[in-house]
C-alpha cells in the first residue's frame, strides 16, 4: 500500500437497488472514473465482454449480479471500497451480508419506475442495519423519467426524509447534466465517456426552479441542523460549506436522505455522485459498531477503529476460486497482517494468515497488512460466512446476521457417473457460501433435497453445478415448504411400557399441548415444565422435551415440520429400575403423535408478496391471473400508462407464473415477489395434501 492509511479518508459503500435499476452499470462507471478499468463494458454489451463487476459467466449471460464483488477505488484523495450487491430478491442474504459490513450506501432508483418492491425490501434491510444512504435517481435519459416524482415516492412509500440536492438539466433525450443546489452551479458531462465535467452558470430557464428547490432543501436542513435553522429564520443565505456540513450531519444521523440524479448509462452525474459519497457518507470512524463479549454473557461493547486495539474482524463472504477458498473480511478494530495468527470465535481454532489480498471484482493485488475500517480478502482460511475472527487478546462476536427460512425445495439427483463425483462437493461449497441454501436427505424417499428463497435462487445453483462442477442434475418438481400447526389446546396422558426380560422401559407423562402465539425471537416450539414434588426425576425432564421436539420435525398430517406448539408437562410417574432417559424420550414422541389429531391440526403455506407491473390495457387479465391463483389484491397504483398490482398469493400457485404473465401481456409484464408470511390453507386443499401424504406412506411401506 503506497498511501499511508488514513481512516477519515475511507468510505465503505454498497450500491443496493431493484433488479435492472442500472446498478452494475453505475459501479462500472465508478471503476472507470476512479481509474480502475480503462474501457467501459455494458452489462449486456455488444462486445460480449460483460460488465467487470459481474465476474461469473452466469451473471454475464443473465445480465443480473449474483455474487457481490468487493473493489477498491481511489477517488481524489479518498479510498472507496465498493461492494456490488445483487438486486434480485432471491439473493437477499447476499444483500444483508453486504449491508452488515458497509458504513454507507447508495440506494439506486430507476427514474421511470421509481420505488419498486425490491427497493422497499432493500430499504427495510438498510434500516435494520442503520446504514446512512444517498439516493441516486438513474436512467434520466429514458422516456418518462421524472426524478421529482421518484423523490415524492421515497417520502410516501419508504417514509424517508428525502431531499433533492440536485435537479436535472433536461430529461429523456434532452438530459445533459444537473444543477447542484448546494453551490448553485450547473454540472455538464462531456467527452466520449463523460469524463470531462464542465461547471457552468445555471441555464436561464432553470434559475427559478433551482431557487425553489434550494429553498425546499434549506427548509428541510433547518429541521436537522440548528445553525441552518437560525439562518433560515433570519432569512440569511447559508454558505455552500454550511449546507454540505448540515447534509452530512443529517445523513449520518439517519435523519435525511439526499437525492441526486443522472444517467450512468449515458455517463451523466456519476462523478458528482462519487463526490457526494466523500462529502456526505461516514468514514469507518464515524459509524458506531458494537460486538458481543463472549466472556461476559454476550454483553455488548463498543468497537473502536483503532489499529492498536485487539483485532475484531468479520468474515462476510466466501468464494471458491482456482486458488482455494477466498474469505472476504471487514476489519472493525485492530489490524491484520500476513503471517498473523487469528482465532475463529465459533470453533476457537487459531489459524495463520498465509495470504492477504485486495480485490478488484475478480482480479487481486497482494498486500501485507490491513487496518481497522478496511475490507480485504484472505486465502487459506477455513470458515463459514458470518464467523468472527479476533487475536489472542479478546473473545468477541459480531452479532449473527438475520437469516430467513427457505420457502421452496427441489429434489435433485446427479444425471450420470461423472456428475455423481462432483455432486456433494458442489452442494458443500454452496452451503458454505450461502446460509439460505439448505441441503438435506429425505430418509423415506432417499432423495437429496435442496431448499432456498425462490425458484430463481435454486435455478441459479442448478446452473452453477453444471457450469462450475461439470455436474448435470435431474431436477424434480418444486416443493413448497408447508408447515403444520395446531389450533386448539388438547390434553395428553401417555404411558410407555415395555417388558422384555431384564430391565424394561417405563415412563408416564401427563400434560397438554396448546397453540403458541408468534414469538418475538421467532421460536416455533416452547416447552414448559410444571412437574412438582419429584414425580419425574429432574434428569428425565429434558428427555421429554427432546422427544416432543424430535416429533415436530415431521408432522403426522402431511409430513412437514410442526410449528407454533407449546408443550406443558404437568405430571407423570417413573419406575426406579425401568425408567430411563430413552423411555421418557419415546414417551414424549408417542404422546405428541397420539394427542395431535385432537388438537385440530392445520396446514400452513407460505404466502408471497407479489408486485406485478403491466401496461394499463392488460390490467384486467393480470388481476384475473392473480385471482385464479388464490391471490388477494392489496393495492393497485397507476403511473404513466402502467399499472402496479400488489397482491398476496400462495407460493404453491406461483409456479409457471412468469410464463403465463409473459404470454398474457405479450412480454411486457414483469413481477417480483418475496416471502410475506405463513397462513392456513383452505380445508379442501388440506384434505388433498393429507390424502396424498397417506397414499405416499402406504406405498413406501409395501
Swiss-Prot record:
Q: Single GO molecular-function term?
A: GTP binding
* GO cellular component terms attached to this protein's record: cytoplasm
Annotated GTP binding lies at 17-24, 84-88, 138-141
- Gene3D superfamilies per UniProt: 3.30.230.10, 3.30.70.240, Elongation Factor G (Translational Gtpase), domain 3 (3.30.70.870), P-loop containing nucleotide triphosphate hydrolases (3.40.50.300), Translation factors (2.40.30.10)
- Keywords tagged on the record: Cytoplasm, Elongation factor, GTP-binding, Nucleotide-binding, Protein biosynthesis
Cellular location of this protein? Answer: Cytoplasm
Q: Where is the tr-type G domain?
A: 8-285
For this protein, the record's Pfam families field holds: EFG_C (PF00679), EFG_III (PF14492), EFG_IV (PF03764), GTP_EFTU (PF00009), GTP_EFTU_D2 (PF03144)
Q: What does this protein do?
A: Catalyzes the GTP-dependent ribosomal translocation step during translation elongation. During this step, the ribosome changes from the pre-translocational (PRE) to the post-translocational (POST) state as the newly formed A-site-bound peptidyl-tRNA and P-site-bound deacylated tRNA move to the P and E sites, respectively. Catalyzes the coordinated movement of the two tRNA molecules, the mRNA and conformational changes in the ribosome.
NCBIfam families in UniProt: EF-G, PRK12740.1-5, small_GTP
Would you identify the family this protein belongs to, as annotated?
Belongs to the TRAFAC class translation factor GTPase superfamily. Classic translation factor GTPase family. EF-G/EF-2 subfamily.
Stated name of the protein: Elongation factor G 2
What is the originating organism of this protein? Bdellovibrio bacteriovorus (strain ATCC 15356 / DSM 50701 / NCIMB 9529 / HD100)
Gene that encodes it: fusA2
Amino acid at each position: 500500500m503506497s498511501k499511508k492509511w488514513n481512516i477519515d479518508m475511507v468510505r465503505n459503500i454498497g450500491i443496493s437497488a431493484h433488479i435492472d435499476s442500472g446498478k452494475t452499470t453505475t459501479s462500472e462507471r465508478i471503476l472507470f472514473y476512479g481509474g480502475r478499468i480503462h474501457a467501459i463494458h455494458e452489462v449486456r454489451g455488444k462486445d460480449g465482454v460483460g460488465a467487470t463487476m459481474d465476474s461469473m459467466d452466469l451473471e454475464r449471460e443473465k445480465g443480473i449480479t449474483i455474487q457481490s464483488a468487493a473493489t477498491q477505488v481511489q477517488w481524489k484523495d479518498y479510498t472507496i471500497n465498493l461492494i456490488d450487491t445483487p438486486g434480485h430478491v432471491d439473493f437477499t442474504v447476499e444483500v444483508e451480508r453486504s449491508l452488515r459490513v458497509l458504513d454507507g450506501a447508495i440506494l439506486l432508483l430507476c427514474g421511470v419506475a421509481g420505488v419498486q418492491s425490491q427497493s422497499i425490501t432493500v430499504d427495510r434491510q438498510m434500516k435494520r442495519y442503520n446504514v446512512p444512504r444517498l439516493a441516486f435517481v438513474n436512467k434520466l435519459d429514458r422516456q418518462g423519467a421524472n426524478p421529482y416524482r421518484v423523490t415524492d415516492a421515497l417520502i410516501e412509500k419508504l417514509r424517508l426524509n428525502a431531499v433533492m440536492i440536485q435537479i436535472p438539466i433536461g430529461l429523456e433525450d434532452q438530459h445533459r447534466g444537473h444543477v447542484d443546489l448546494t453551490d448553485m452551479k450547473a454540472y455538464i458531462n462531456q467527452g466520449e465517456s463523460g469524463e470531462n465535467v464542465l461547471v457552468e452558470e445555471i441555464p436561464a430557464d432553470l434559475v427559478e426552479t433551482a431557487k425553489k428547490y434550494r429553498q425546499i432543501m434549506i427548509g428541510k436542513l433547518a429541521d436537522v441542523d440548528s445553525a441552518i435553522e437560525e439562518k433560515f429564520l433570519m432569512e440569511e443565505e447559508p454558505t455552500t460549506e454550511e449546507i454540505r456540513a448540515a447534509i452530512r450531519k443529517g445523513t449520518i444521523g439517519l435523519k435525511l436522505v439526499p437525492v441526486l440524479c443522472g444517467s450512468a448509462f449515458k455517463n451523466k452525474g456519476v462523478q458528482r455522485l462519487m463526490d457526494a459519497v466523500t462529502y456526505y457518507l461516514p468514514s469507518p470512524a464515524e459509524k458506531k459498531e458494537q460486538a458481543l463479549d463472549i466472556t461476559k454473557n454476550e454483553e455488548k461493547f463498543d468497537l473502536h477503529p483503532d489499529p492498536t486495539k485487539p483485532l475484531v474482524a468479520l468474515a462476510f463472504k466466501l468464494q471458491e476460486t482456482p486458488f482455494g477458498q477466498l474469505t472476504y473480511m471487514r476489519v472493525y478494530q485492530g489490524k491484520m497482517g500476513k503471517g498473523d495468527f487469528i482465532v475463529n470465535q465459533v470453533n476457537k481454532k487459531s489459524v495463520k494468515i498465509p495470504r492477504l489480498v485486495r480485490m478488484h471484482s475478480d482480479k487481486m493485488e497482494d498486500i501485507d497488512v490491513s487496518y481497522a475500517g478496511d475490507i480485504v480478502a484472505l486465502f487459506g482460511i477455513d470458515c463459514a460466512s458470518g464467523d468472527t475472527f479476533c487475536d489472542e487478546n479478546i473473545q468477541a462476536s459480531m452479532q449473527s446476521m438475520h437469516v430467513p427460512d427457505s420457502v421452496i425445495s427441489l429434489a435433485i439427483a446427479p444425471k450420470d457417473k461423472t456428475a455423481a463425483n462432483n455432486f456433494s462437493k458442489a452442494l458443500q461449497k454452496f452451503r458454505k457460501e450461502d446460509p439460505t441454501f439448505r441441503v438435506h436427505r429425505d430418509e423415506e424417499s432417499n432423495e437429496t433435497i435442496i431448499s432456498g428463497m425462490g425458484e430463481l435462487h435454486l435455478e441459479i445453483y442448478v446452473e452453477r453445478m453444471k457450469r462450475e462442477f461439470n455436474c448435470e442434475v435431474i431436477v424434480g418438481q418444486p416443493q413448497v415448504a408447508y408447515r403444520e400447526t395446531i389450533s386448539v389446546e388438547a390434553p395428553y396422558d401417555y404411558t410407555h411400557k415395555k417388558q422384555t426380560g431384564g430391565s424394561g422401559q417405563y415412563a408416564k407423562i401427563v400434560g397438554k399441548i396448546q397453540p403458541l402465539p408468534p414469538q418475538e425471537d421467532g421460536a416455533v416450539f416452547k416447552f414448559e415444565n410444571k412437574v412438582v414434588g419429584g414425580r419425574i426425576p429432574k434428569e428425565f425432564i429434558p428427555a421429554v422435551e427432546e422427544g416432543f421436539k424430535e416429533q415436530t420435525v415431521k408432522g403426522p398430517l402431511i409430513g412437514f415440520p410442526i410449528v407454533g406448539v407449546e408443550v406443558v408437562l404437568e405430571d407423570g410417574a417413573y419406575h426406579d429400575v425401568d425408567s430411563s432417559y430413552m423411555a421418557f424420550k419415546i414417551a414424549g414422541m408417542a404422546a405428541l403423535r397420539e394427542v395431535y389429531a385432537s388438537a385440530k391440526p392445520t396446514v400452513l403455506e407460505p404466502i408471497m408478496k407479489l408486485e406485478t407491473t403491466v401496461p394499463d390495457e392488460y390490467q384486467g387479465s393480470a388481476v384475473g391471473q392473480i385471482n385464479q391463483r388464490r391471490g388477494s389484491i392489496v393495492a393497485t397504483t397507476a403511473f404513466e400508462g402502467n399499472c402496479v398490482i400488489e397482491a398476496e398469493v400462495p407460493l404453491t400457485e406461483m409456479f409457471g407464473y412468469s410464463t403465463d404473465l409473459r404470454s398474457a401481456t405479450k412480454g411486457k409484464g414483469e413481477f417480483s415477489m418475496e416471502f410475506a408470511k405463513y397462513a392456513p390453507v383452505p380445508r379442501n386443499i388440506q384434505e388433498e395434501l393429507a390424502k396424498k401424504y397417506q397414499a405416499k406412506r402406504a406405498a413406501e411401506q409395501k
